[in-house]
Swiss-Prot record:
Organism, scientific name: Flavobacterium psychrophilum (strain ATCC 49511 / DSM 21280 / CIP 103535 / JIP02/86)
Subunit structure of this chain's protein: Part of the 30S ribosomal subunit. Interacts with proteins S7 and S18. Binds to IF-3.
A Pfam family of this chain: Ribosomal_S11
Family (UniProt): Belongs to the universal ribosomal protein uS11 family.
PANTHER family: 40S RIBOSOMAL PROTEIN S14/30S RIBOSOMAL PROTEIN S11 (PTHR11759)
An example Gene Ontology CC term for this record: ribosome
MF (Gene Ontology): rRNA binding; structural constituent of ribosome
Top-level taxon in the UniProt lineage: Bacteria
Protein name: Small ribosomal subunit protein uS11
Keyword terms of this UniProt record: Ribonucleoprotein, Ribosomal protein, RNA-binding, rRNA-binding
NCBIfam families: PRK05309.1, uS11_bact
Role noted for this protein: Located on the platform of the 30S subunit, it bridges several disparate RNA helices of the 16S rRNA. Forms part of the Shine-Dalgarno cleft in the 70S ribosome.
One of the GO BP terms on file: translation
Amino acid sequence: MAKASTKKRKVIVESIGEAHISATFNNIIISLTNKKGEVVSWSSAGKMGFRGSKKNTPYAAQMAAEDCSKVAMEAGMKKVKVYVKGPGNGRESAIRSLHNAGIEVTEIIDVTPLPHNGCRPPKRRRV
């Protein structure tokens, strides 16, 4: 059977971009995009090999942010505007490790969605 020839699309990378950090209760997903919103590099705690309850730890977020920023810096990204979404543990450590990796953080914006009393939340856990 012939292999389908798919051409990998090339994303135009500028020196200024955006970092979208989604920190849920179960996982942390970090996407570095250009100004248009096209993804330059992405990483998550699950992609880094963490499983189960270890995925939502500050250390897992740090490892994911370092992996993501390494690829973006090779592509030529230098400054990012950070958008943080969700209530997860690794929010601050992901931002800190982006900065320590050599990418300058210009501003941090919290875009966590807040309901105007929409859906009923899940019932309380009884352990």
